[in-house]
Design a protein with these regions (language model features):
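Conserved alpha/beta-hydrolase catalytic His-Asp/Glu region
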Residues: 100-138
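Conserved hydrolase catalytic core segment
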Residues: 38-75
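Short beta-strand/loop motif that positions the catalytic acidic residue
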Residues: 152, 158-160, 164
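Conserved acidic catalytic loop of the alpha/beta-hydrolase fold
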Residues: 23-39
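Conserved alpha/beta-hydrolase "acid-adjacent" motif
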Residues: 165-174
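Conserved alpha/beta-hydrolase
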Residues: 1-13
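Catalytic active-site module of serine/aspartate enzymes centered on a nucleophile-bearing elbow/loop
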Residues: 182-214
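Flexible "cap/lid" loop of the alpha/beta hydrolase fold
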Residues: 65-94, 137-138
Length: 214
């Protein structure tokens, strides 16, 4: 797995708040160069958005899989849903230039990321691992730096979760239609479909597709 700057074990070249999507795209491009060959990229959520940027940079990749990815037209629909669902959290996010207010409660974390029946202790343990994201990168995904579709793109796959409230199944289908590729929606899966109860089904779909790229 690739740790973007300021994430995981990677060092931060600057304060997280000032990272841009273009910075993260550069991180992935650098990783592809180091790995060599033609790797397959798998991007989840914002990672999928970054991979879409990679798709038109002629990087030497043999395929790109988008898992519960932010759509090509940006996350403005998500912002609207947040405004309806929890307007105070959204106002605080913009006031503080931070996304942490959006995940300030156990209910919000479960609703956005996890299976609906996840017990509170597990939700809290998951929430303790969450870090703030660059607000500039969020604005890039909202409007400022949307990915462009290249004339020629690498083979792609889109996988979404039926119960995803962050990147809706309909948005995943629109994303797949935009790139002219297959879309698979995993029944009952939330946004973090790769780590919840339906992870095996998502992994199997991904593995089947990867085998076609071998």
């Amino acid at each position: 797995a690739i740790d973007l700057r300021g994430h995981g074990e990677s060092e931060a070249a600057k304060t997280m708040r000032w990272n841009r999507i273009a910075d993260y795209v550069d991180d992935v491009s650098h990783a592809v160069e180091i790995i060599g060959g033609k790797p397959i990229l798998v991007g989840h959520s914002m990672g999928g958005f970054i991979c879409q940027h990679i798709s038109h940079r002629n990087e030497p990749v043999s395929g790109i899989a988008l898992l519960a990815s932010a759509p090509h037209y940006g996350v403005w629909r998500l912002v609207f849903r947040m405004l309806v669902k929890d307007p105070l959290a959204l106002i605080l996010s913009f006031a503080k230039l931070s996304l942490l207010p959006v995940i300030r409660s156990t209910h919000a974390i479960r609703d956005m990321f996890l299976d609906a029946n996840t017990p509170d202790p597990k939700v809290k343990a998951f929430g303790a691992k969450l870090i703030d994201e660059s607000f500039l990168a969020f604005l890039d995904m909202l409007l400022l730096d949307l990915p462009k579709r290249a004339a020629t793109i690498p083979p792609m796959l889109v996988i979404g979760g039926e119960k995803d409230t962050v990147c809706l199944p309909s948005e995943q289908q629109s994303l797949a239609d935009y790139y002219g590729v297959a879309c698979h929606i995993i029944e009952d899966a939330p946004h973090n479909l790769m780590s919840q109860t339906k992870w095996q089904e998502a992994a199997d779909k991904l593995a089947e597709w990867v085998e076609t790229r071998a």
